[in-house]
């Protein structure tokens, strides 16, 4: 299986995503934002960072990159797509997932191990989890507060489109503690925390007393590998 990671000007976590894919047993494929070729990949990752310096709005300029027309088309045909942090912002700007992301309510950049609850384990990216499972994934952003209209929020909650929720203290003012969502079809998932930074043991707090931030993120990538192979 081949999973593409798209690099944009200002991407920071593309190499981490490529490594996570390799550790999950798939072939990572580096893709460039200026191309119109997905190179026959089976799934896509839009990584974190500060694409185009976060000018205008986070993810706004990147969502208009040449390769995004191929991403939108592939997502429409059912290809699994994962947007992480800045990638989530791109997905929202491209209207591939509902809602939007704005400045954290406290106005500060945050970087810590974040406790999450899995709300939907039926997407290609979350099939390795169980609904209600508690996990810890690193979180780092300045504009990660999830917003949506009251009507849209009701639909998200009612149709199971919330995929992850912050557990404990809400770190950025996201409505309903929402950390990640999916599209209606379920193949496109966006979240602010960084699963690609939690794929190997020994990184982050990993004692029984502390929040665990070691390998919880690996399940995102092994899940999509299994899902794609089953469908094949």
From Swiss-Prot:
Pathway: Purine metabolism; IMP biosynthesis via de novo pathway; 5-amino-1-(5-phospho-D-ribosyl)imidazole from N(2)-formyl-N(1)-(5-phospho-D-ribosyl)glycinamide: step 1/2. Keywords: ATP-binding, Cytoplasm, Glutamine amidotransferase, Hydrolase, Ligase, Nucleotide-binding, Purine biosynthesis. Gene3D superfamilies: 3.40.50.880. The gene is purQ. Part of the FGAM synthase complex composed of 1 PurL, 1 PurQ and 2 PurS subunits. It comes from Leifsonia xyli subsp. xyli (strain CTCB07). Disulfide bonds: none annotated. GO terms for molecular function: ATP binding; glutaminase activity; phosphoribosylformylglycinamidine synthase activity. Its EC number is 6.3.5.3, 3.5.1.2. This is Phosphoribosylformylglycinamidine synthase subunit PurQ. Transmembrane segments: none annotated. GO terms for biological process: 'de novo' IMP biosynthetic process. GO terms for cellular component: cytoplasm. The active site is at residues 85, 194, 196. It holds the Pfam family GATase_5. It is found in: Cytoplasm. PROSITE patterns: GATASE_TYPE_1. It catalyses: N(2)-formyl-N(1)-(5-phospho-beta-D-ribosyl)glycinamide + L-glutamine + ATP + H2O = 2-formamido-N(1)-(5-O-phospho-beta-D-ribosyl)acetamidine + L-glutamate + ADP + phosphate + H(+); L-glutamine + H2O = L-glutamate + NH4(+). Residues 2-232 form the Glutamine amidotransferase type-1 domain. Part of the phosphoribosylformylglycinamidine synthase complex involved in the purines biosynthetic pathway. Catalyzes the ATP-dependent conversion of formylglycinamide ribonucleotide (FGAR) and glutamine to yield formylglycinamidine ribonucleotide (FGAM) and glutamate. The FGAM synthase complex is composed of three subunits. PurQ produces an ammonia molecule by converting glutamine to glutamate. PurL transfers the ammonia molecule to FGAR to form FGAM in an ATP-dependent manner. It comes from the Bacteria. InterPro entries: Class_I_gatase-like, PRibForGlyAmidine_synth_PurQ. Its main location: cytoplasm.
């Amino acid at each position: 299986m081949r999973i593409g990671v798209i690099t944009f000007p200002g991407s920071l976590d593309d190499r981490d995503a490529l490594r996570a894919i390799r550790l999950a047993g798939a072939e990572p494929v580096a893709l460039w934002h200026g191309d119109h070729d997905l190179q026959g990949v089976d799934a896509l990752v839009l990584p974190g960072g500060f694409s185009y310096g976060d000018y205008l709005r986070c993810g706004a300029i990147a969502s208009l990159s040449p390769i995004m027309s191929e991403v939108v088309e592939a997502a429409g045909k059912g290809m699994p797509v994962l947007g992480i942090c800045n990638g989530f912002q791109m997905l929202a700007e491209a209207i591939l997932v509902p809602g939007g992301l704005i400045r954290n309510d406290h106005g500060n950049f945050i970087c810590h191990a974040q406790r999450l609850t899995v709300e939907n384990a039926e997407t290609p990216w979350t099939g390795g989890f169980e609904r209600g499972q508690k996990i810890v994934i690193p979180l780092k952003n300045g504009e990660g507060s999830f917003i949506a209209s009251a009507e849209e929020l009701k639909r998200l909650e009612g149709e199971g489109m919330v995929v992850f929720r912050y557990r404990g203290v809400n770190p950025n003012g996201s409505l309903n503690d929402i950390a990640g969502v999916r599209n209606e079809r379920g193949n496109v998932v966006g979240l602010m925390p960084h699963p690609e930074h939690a794929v190997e043991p020994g990184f982050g707090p990993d004692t029984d007393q502390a929040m665990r931030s070691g390998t919880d993120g690996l399940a995102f990538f092994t899940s999509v590998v299994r899902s794609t192979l089953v469908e094949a």
